[in-house]
């Protein structure tokens, strides 16, 4: 009597796809897509057209996932030596380097085609430039070359609102660049707070993060200064008439909270404060862009 087909291989297939999905850094991409969506919405005074909305979000997400996978590939050696990242798919051998490269290439290529065909070539090429900036210029070079790696490389990570804007308008606009400036200034205190918490691990793998090369106190001062600069930048949408009172109130509260956290980090000696600043920065960016979105539709 014939035996029924076995489905015992299904769990391994499921685990394999989970490994590939993990390489795309879905939580990071999700936050990035929020800023893309806000860029799209602020660019249009009316309801967004469906095709560039869907194609733009999908294509940008795929190319961002490709960049993240390349980051996993390039950093696989140091990831295996750090407590925060040792369990990633490549250090654990769940995905080979060859398959990771193929996955990143296919995902990025498909995302580029979607953007080029269904949105516009400008957005496709800008997203490709961001991919190169993050995966190759930052990850492969700047990260290992200078303690200003986050500052210089942060430009690539600040591009999503501009990508969203161009996806629906096919043109640059100064308002989109204001959103880029906000994320650009948000990036250093966000990552430096994490670097303070993980400074011993970065030193172990010879990554010249600012706390490793210039010390923790200097880094805390830089975090505080950047949060003040960020607070000023967050007011720019109001000053140019891009946003109204709702955003102004939300932005002011969020900036006050961020500066307070950075002040605590600088002047209070507590090991857990660095991670508090890191976590607060994530909520800060998410809520700030949600406030931009709500203000656009409720106050306009």
Curated annotation (Swiss-Prot):
Segments passing through the bilayer: 28-48, 54-74, 100-120, 122-142, 149-169, 176-196, 222-242, 243-263, 280-300
Main location: membrane
GO MF annotation list: protoheme IX farnesyltransferase activity
Gene3D superfamilies registered for this protein in UniProt: UbiA prenyltransferase (1.10.357.140)
Pfam family membership, one: UbiA
EC number: 2.5.1.141
Pathway it works in: Porphyrin-containing compound metabolism; heme O biosynthesis; heme O from protoheme: step 1/1
Note: Carbon 2 of the heme B porphyrin ring is defined according to the Fischer nomenclature.
Function: Converts heme B (protoheme IX) to heme O by substitution of the vinyl group on carbon 2 of heme B porphyrin ring with a hydroxyethyl farnesyl side group.
Protein name: Protoheme IX farnesyltransferase 1
